[in-house]
Amino acid sequence: MKKGKDAEQDFLNWLDENKFSYLYINQDTESFPKLFTNQVKRPDFLLLIDSIGLIAIDIKNYNIFKDKHLSLNYESEFKKTLAFERLFRLPVWYVYKNNDEWLWISALKAIEVAEMKINSGTNEQFLSLNIDDFTIVKSNSDIG
């Protein structure tokens, strides 16, 4: 949990340094309607990008495994994020912290390029994402 919060704070600082317009979304359970509990995962940020428009951002801070892959839990993360995208008609992007850069991938691209795997410890499905399928962003000049 702390690792995720640290990444959110780092991303918030990065947004400020790069002069982006954004909203940081409160993650308290009281701030989200009970109707959506356990069905929708809200993003961490809403980000306004001049060349694209408004997008939702979900920050991740996971370790790269086998030097090339990042994971995303299918049930608790991906399906609930896609429900948010569908309900609010707002594209969701996953942004993974990777040292001094950010790896970006849209939720729709993630499902297209990922390999579905099973976690041997939990028996849960997850998406295995190759880092080559991400867009690397170090500054706002790397975005459209």
Where are these regions (language model features)?
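Nucleic-acid nuclease catalytic cores
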Residues: 82-110
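Intrinsically disordered, low-complexity terminal regions enriched in charged/polar residues
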Residues: 103-144
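Active-site metal-binding core of divalent-cation-utilizing nuclease and nuclease-like domains
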Residues: 24-52
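Mg2+/Mn2+-dependent nuclease catalytic core
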Residues: 62-84
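A structural signal for short, well-ordered beta-strand segments and their strand-loop junctions
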Residues: 23-24, 56-58, 92-96
